[in-house]
């Protein structure tokens, strides 16, 4: 699924295009995301004891390709977890990562995982929420935060209002597919600043499906 036409997993051949350098840098030179494998998560209840991939950082223009490679290296199987800590980033790449997570039957949570597998609270905002939505189920770690805001076009557009509406429609379609209530798009539309969702609000939206009592 591409939220903005012409953007997705791709290998640029024409390096004269400005965005090509950003892609190659994110893919091969200095990826904007980092990852580490956790062999056994220390989390409460059904979320605990799983193998996990901890992913943190900003979602860059080549993040989906990078993520697929890290998944293959981690040897995660259905029911394993992606633990997220990210301020957001590229909307299209986030949606593709969410689709990859869903296609592999992985679950998601927000937090920071150390080498022992213990998870501490963290945050997942903006485009990261689309990645989080790809999980099934989606665990809510006590103290972690999910933040949303209105997405707008980042490149010059002839009709920015129409483009913003189109992006909102695409996000709505994606979230609906992932089983999240349409009310999340209403929350996004309220502000361009990050709006942090309360635990009960995220649960009511079905963004969080399984609260975790102890991080």
Regions found by a protein language model. Name each.
Residues 26, 30, 36-66:
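STAS-typified acidic loop motif
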Residues 59-80:
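A short, well-ordered alpha-helical element
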Residues 55, 82, 132, 202:
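Terminal peptide-recognition signature
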Residues 102, 106-152:
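Glycine-rich beta-to-alpha active-site loop
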Residues 78-93, 107-114:
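Short, glycine-/small-residue-enriched flexible loop/hinge segments at domain edges that mediate gating
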Residues 149-215:
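Charged, glycine-interspersed solvent-exposed loop segments at helix/strand-loop junctions
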Residues 1-14:
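Hydrophobic membrane-insertion alpha-helices, especially the h-region
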